[in-house]
């Protein structure tokens, strides 16, 4: 797996994609977070789709930009909690300079919650784009063709999830289990009784 970011393009791309980063984060410090985020996005969209995006390597391409933004947002969420702390020989120390002050815990919590909401909203945009443009999503994990509830539109006839494709995909394992353990045995019983 290759990253969508390199030491040469990271700072400019990261600021451009997140829209809120106002400082240069050294690539070496955030690289482990970028790797974790990339694996998570590959798990969602599938390796074939990721490889297709990686081959483009152009921020002007909408699909590339959507995937790269998802990786950047998730990497930032992973990186942020440790970015203000330094592990020294004397234990953890708060990084601070003369121009800034340490935020209150509630401010940090609110900030991290808003980052997460932004990330989830963006994943929905990415998934909508992929569905609309017939891009394959990780079909091994999110194959819905054999389900009674094959798509989000059918699901939302009964439960409103505000059009969140990401939430729908997260609920799929439970839907599959419910259909196999609860619905299919009942349908087989009804079919047997009517024969």
Tell what function each PLM region has:
Residues 1-68, 82-195:
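Conserved short "hinge" loops at termini or chain/domain junctions
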